[in-house]
């Protein structure tokens, strides 16, 4: 298992319950792929340096999870087909992390 971090830029027009449903879907994908969520940090609404899809504000969420490398492709596929996500980036934080029970 490896440790990954995904930063999401969500539409400011998404309601709080829609955001939670979207994050619940992504959490479900991680767990379905034999991964484990470590943290989900809501950074909140922030001003953007330039317009993204005609918006100057966006809602940031940082997801940190343990998963096999193949799981990232499935998480990113689900992000791409989801409405309300403007941008995302995924980085590998650590190789071969041992899962603590």
Curated annotation (Swiss-Prot):
It comes from the Bacteria. Pfam families: Ribosomal_S6 (PF01250). GO terms for biological process: translation. Coiled coil: none annotated. GO terms for cellular component: cytoplasm; ribonucleoprotein complex; ribosome. GO terms for molecular function: small ribosomal subunit rRNA binding; structural constituent of ribosome. The keyword Ribonucleoprotein applies. Keywords: Ribonucleoprotein, Ribosomal protein, RNA-binding, rRNA-binding. Belongs to the bacterial ribosomal protein bS6 family. Binds together with bS18 to 16S ribosomal RNA. This is Small ribosomal subunit protein bS6. It comes from Nitratidesulfovibrio vulgaris (strain DSM 19637 / Miyazaki F) (Desulfovibrio vulgaris). The gene is rpsF.
């Amino acid at each position: 298992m490896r440790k990954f971090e995904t930063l999401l830029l969500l539409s400011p027009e998404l309601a709080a319950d829609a955001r939670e449903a979207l994050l619940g879907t992504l959490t479900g994908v991680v767990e379905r792929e034999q991964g484990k969520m470590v943290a989900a940090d809501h950074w909140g609404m922030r001003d953007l340096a330039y317009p993204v899809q005609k918006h100057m504000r966006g809602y940031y969420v940082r997801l940190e999870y343990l998963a096999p490398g193949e799981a990232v492709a499935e998480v990113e596929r689900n992000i791409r087909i989801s409405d309300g996500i403007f941008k995302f980036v995924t980085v590998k934080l650590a190789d071969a992390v041992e899962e603590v029970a």
